[in-house]
Amino acid sequence: MLVHPNPDPIAFSIGPVDIHWYGLMYVLAFAMFIILGRVRIKQPHIAAQGWKPEDLDDMLFYGMLGVVLGGRLGEVLFYQPGYFFENPLEIFKVWKGGMSFHGGFLGVLIAMALWARKSKRNILDVYDFIAPMVPLGYAAGRLGNFINHELPGRIADPSLPWAMLWPNPNGIGFLDTPRHPSPLYQMLIDGILVFLILWPFARKARPRLAVGAMFTLLYGCARFFTEWFRVPDWETTVMGLPITSGQVLSLPMIVAALVMLAWAYSSRDGRQTLRST
């Protein structure tokens, strides 16, 4: 059995300004977007579409706004509306954590649609381009959740080698029963594993929307699975089976991804895009 290291959420201070680990994970995520993006624009089928390094800088600016605004708004609306209604000023304290991936996902889609319109690019091509860079950034965010000891897991069998004593939310000691380290599960499965599958898939020319749809499908399925190990923000039942808030939000992603994949591989537009790269 393991014990959560329970580090100080403040990594270091510069004068009166505290730099939080959670914020540093977002910096790491944005840096990986640029690094992976520079690798991606050198791939022949991507270079043929005319992507340039300066496009990455523009997309990063739009994407940062989409992630932060959408992620926070999603946390408020999807997960903790009651808490934020009673404590509205807490909405602005993003350094404490509390960012919804599903909200950030929608925020980034809106931001990329705006950038695509500005740059006169097809939004489907933009989604295909950025999708392989998302999972590692997501993994960094989940590591930030772990450092902040957020998203505690469900009670685990003490004999499980990686069962973990989790810090008590009241700040004193640890919870009595070991837990699944759910942020690490989501970092490894929803983030790193999805990246390891998606990146090789995206290295070859695919029909328009195929890469974006594959990311949506992989993440939706991975998130649906890892939600079983996480204490849900809220839970409901579907056909008599308990289902968590994250699973409710992931199901539409899975359905939409299957529709998008079918369109990508059967539509004339998707096949034409593949022939032109």
PLM features per residue range, with description:
Residues 1-277:
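Hydrophobic, membrane-interfacing alpha helices
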